[in-house]
């Protein structure tokens, strides 16, 4: 079976064939200068139509033709009835061209593609191996991750999985803020308390989060401590830039608290099925940041204020607020080091993707402006902004210690998953340990799906019941896969040859049509940086399979050829579902 005759994207190939036929028909009768747009409606309201196009309606005025007559001419001249995969073409209403696909041929094409490509089905060569750096999560290492960080991590992780799947050379990075004021507060408190060890059984990020909260309270009560912390920060930066040995004790405190918090973050992210390829430290760019400041001063675009601080005016970029590059004592700020970090990334990748909270929009505008001043193309930085998650429990604040940690959130999800399983009678025959494992995977799938299915630019009003619903949430998708695997286990037979002509009932064909669109949804997710596109597709696919499962018998069919064809359809669904769930990071469960 040659790859040339087995398309990676059967639906798009079919659409292209139909569009070409329609364009050729129009060009053969009318003089049209430009490439004709042929919009396709994938959900036409006409009974019996799988696709439709209003192309005649949009062209009629330009060609001075009656739209219905134009549509009939297009159908007649294009011989759409003879186009491969099209069974019938006809005109309805004022000029809509409706198309019914040849179910047998289209089913054969789609299933051939799924079985030929297997675990690669859905993957298109969008990236052509080009190097990309994708940065996500990058939470301050001064306490545990909270659910907002979880949204960042899930969005970034799904985009990374999809970009790797579509042949981008992706390196996933976590930018570690190891020299900001918050870390200085934590390092100061750590030294003050005598460098305490993390108690056995306690996560390091939780322990240091408590220390940080205590430090914040002490500084709030005694504002003079602010200067002590500032001295800590200045000493650490001098250590990094000038290798000043007298600050080794302070530097060691900074590095210890950062590494310990980061260790806790990694544990949480692993549970959420999120991984990073590289951890890049802000402190690595302390010297580079100073060089950038000098360069901007030499270029005449930055200036030193009377108090000694260096600033750059961004009014030419429509930004009223000037950007401060250094403090009056000459030390750099996070923004300056972030500029250095992005220059470093751009030197190593075709383009960069950053996943950031919506509150970073001004900072990104400033970053783009300075990069443009430095003659770097800011369009090579693609930023995915996301809004916040609102929990029933209320707001989160790492500063005062009032927040819901991501660990607590995942534990709550697991507890509720166990309760849902018990209420639904799921996995009753299994041991407590096995049920715990299934509950954990249901919880992770539920949380990831609940985050993924909402467009990043919209806030999430988190609903526990909906997230863990076996009819709407992540478990709904896992259950579809488990049902399919159950059918194949019970059948206990290997089907090598089958006739797709036996898959012509409405429910089977709807499932086939839905599966044929998987590659296109992956591509849209990557191009638009929208995990919600893929998540919604996953829900629709699962819903279609559940309907098929309930309406179409597979195991108890007298006709062997029908049974074999339906078994292959179920097997094809497990391939698509597993590929899809892997991209979304949703655990696959063979039994539920």
From Swiss-Prot:
Its main location: cytoplasm. GO terms for cellular component: cytoplasm. SMART domains: Arg_tRNA_synt_N, DALR_1. Keywords: Aminoacyl-tRNA synthetase, ATP-binding, Cytoplasm, Ligase, Nucleotide-binding, Protein biosynthesis. It comes from the Archaea. A motif ('HIGH' region) lies at residues 139-149. InterPro entries: aa-tRNA-synth_I_CS, Arg-tRNA-ligase, Arg-tRNA-synth_N, Arg-tRNA-synth_N_sf, ArgRS_core, DALR_anticod-bd, Rossmann-like_a/b/a_fold, tRNAsynth_Ia_anticodon-bd. It is found in: Cytoplasm. GO terms for biological process: arginyl-tRNA aminoacylation. PROSITE patterns: AA_TRNA_LIGASE_I. GO terms for molecular function: arginine-tRNA ligase activity; ATP binding. It catalyses: tRNA(Arg) + L-arginine + ATP = L-arginyl-tRNA(Arg) + AMP + diphosphate. It is an enzyme of class 6 (ligase). Its EC number is 6.1.1.19. HAMAP family: Arg_tRNA_synth. NCBIfam families: argS. Belongs to the class-I aminoacyl-tRNA synthetase family. This is Arginine--tRNA ligase. The gene is argS.
């Amino acid at each position: 079976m040659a790859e040339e005759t087995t398309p990676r994207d059967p639906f798009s190939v079919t659409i292209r064939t139909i569009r070409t036929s329609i364009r050729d028909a129009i060009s053969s009768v009318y003089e049209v200068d430009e490439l004709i747009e042929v919009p396709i409606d994938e959900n036409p309201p006409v009974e019996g139509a799988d696709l439709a196009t209003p192309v005649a309606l949009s062209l009629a005025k330009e060609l001075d033709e009656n739209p219905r007559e134009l549509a009939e001419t297009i159908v007649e001249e294009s011989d759409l009835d003879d186009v491969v995969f099209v069974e019938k073409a006809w005109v309805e209403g004022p000029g809509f061209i409706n198309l019914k696909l040849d179910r047998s041929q289209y089913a054969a094409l789609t299933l051939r593609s799924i079985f030929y490509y297997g675990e690669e089905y859905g993957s298109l060569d969008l990236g052509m191996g080009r190097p990309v750096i994708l940065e996500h999560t990058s939470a301050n290492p001064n306490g545990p991750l909270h659910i907002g960080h979880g949204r960042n991590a899930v969005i970034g992780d799904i985009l990374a999985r999809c970009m790797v799947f579509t042949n981008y050379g992706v390196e996933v990075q976590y930018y570690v803020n190891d020299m900001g004021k918050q870390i200085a507060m934590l390092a100061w408190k750590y030294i003050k308390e005598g460098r305490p060890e993390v108690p056995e059984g306690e996560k390091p990020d939780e322990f240091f989060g408590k220390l940080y909260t205590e430090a914040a309270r002490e500084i709030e009560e005694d504002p003079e401590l602010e200067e002590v912390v500032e001295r800590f920060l200045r000493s650490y930066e001098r250590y990094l830039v000038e290798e000043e040995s007298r600050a080794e004790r302070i530097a060691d405190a900074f590095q210890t608290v950062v590494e310990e918090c980061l260790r806790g973050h990694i544990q949480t992210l692993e549970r959420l099925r999120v991984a990073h390829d590289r951890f890049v430290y802000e402190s690595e760019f302390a010297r580079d940041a100073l060089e950038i400041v000098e360069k901007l001063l030499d270029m005449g675009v930055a200036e030193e204020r009377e108090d000694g601080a260096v600033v750059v005016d961004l009014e030419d970029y429509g930004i009223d607020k000037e950007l401060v590059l250094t403090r009056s004592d000459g030390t750099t700020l996070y923004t300056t080091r972030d500029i250095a970090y992005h220059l470093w990334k751009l030197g190593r990748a075709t383009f960069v993707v950053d996943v950031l909270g919506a509150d970073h929009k001004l900072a990104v505008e400033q970053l783009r402006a300075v990069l443009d001043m430095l003659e770097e193309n800011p369009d090579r930085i693609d930023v995915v902004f996301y809004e916040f998650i609102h929990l029933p429990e209320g707001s989160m604040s790492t500063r005062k210690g009032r927040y819901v940690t991501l660990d607590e959130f995942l534990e709550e999800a697991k507890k509720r998953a166990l309760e849902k399983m018990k209420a639904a009678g799921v996995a009753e025959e299994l041991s407590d340990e096995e049920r715990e494992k299934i509950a954990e995977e249901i919880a992770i799938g539920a949380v990831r799906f609940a985050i993924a299915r909402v467009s990043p630019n919209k806030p999430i009003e988190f609903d526990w019941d909906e997230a863990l619903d076996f009819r709407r949430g992540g478990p709904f998708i896992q259950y579809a896969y488990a049902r399919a695997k159950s059918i194949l286990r019970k059948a206990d037979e290997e089907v090598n040859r089958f006739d797709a002509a036996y898959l012509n009932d409405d429910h089977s064909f709807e499932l086939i049509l839905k599966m044929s669109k998987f590659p296109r949804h992956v591509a849209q997710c990557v191009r638009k940086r929208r995990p919600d596109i893929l998540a919604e597709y996953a829900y629709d696919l699962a819903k279609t399979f559940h309907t098929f499962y309930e309406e179409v018998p597979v195991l108890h069919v007298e006709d062997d050829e029908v049974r074999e064809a339906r078994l292959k359809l179920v097997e094809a669904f497990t391939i698509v579902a597993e590929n899809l769930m892997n991209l979304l990071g949703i655990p696959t469960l063979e039994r539920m």
